[in-house]
Amino acid sequence: APGDRTAVVAWNGFEQATVVEIPAEAELDAPVRINVANVEGTRAQHLMIRAGAFSKATVILSHAGSAQAALNQTVEVETGDSANLTVVSLQEWDDTVLHASNQRLALGRDSKLTHIVVTFGGDLVRLCADTDFRGPGAELTMLGIYFVDGGQHLEHRVFVDHSQPKCFSRVTYKGALQGKDAHSVWIGDCLIREAADGTDTYELNRNLVLTEGAKADSVPNLEIENGEIEGAGHASATGRFDDEQLFYLMSRGVPEAEARRLVVRGFFAELINQIGVPEVVDHLMATVEAELA
């Protein structure tokens, strides 16, 4: 059962669930889309995404529009044995929205899950992603991108629970902040349990503070109960806009506004190019450009 308070409220409060079932051995050419928009009142929502054994698919969960109160959401993702699933969660709300999303990820034996979180909109957005390895040999990639404007609070919490042997995980989140009282929080927890021989894991969070008055909190945590692992590490870095990079570009005739865009685009591009869903990549680059306009 969920332990986070908002997760408990969402778990107990939903009236019906939306289920996306990908049959075993199916390979879907086009992404499956789930659109959540214009929420009215305080709502608890429950979504389930299940990928059958040996299936391959991409699911895009898009949040956009306005809300008069708040959305408290549970998203369950399950990959069957040897499945290959990509889940993209886009948060592009209007500036008035409160959104808490608790995303629970379960990986079967030898399966691959790529979990991508993109947060640009909302007044307060809090997304927690918890991972449970249910069989050996599973591979997890978690990518996160967020852009925080003045007055926004965007919070991302990750928990990777390595309880099975020979599993692999990589967690990389990057964020940029601009404007007074822009605030981001990233907390990354990784636990390697005693039974998880051969674990290979690494988590990274980087933040780029573009203006005065913005604040980024970053807390990576790693707990190891097993000495027989392939590797484990974590890193966090938060820095201000690099004036030397800006000067270098401007000294070669690049206008200041364009130079700033180039630096920020370069900061995000490495991560965006790993997403592997062309329509999402193009959309994100355009959104970053709009944030900097």
Show where each model-derived region lies.
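Conserved beta-strand/loop scaffold segments within soluble protein domains that form the structured core
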Residues: 2-254, 268, 272-293
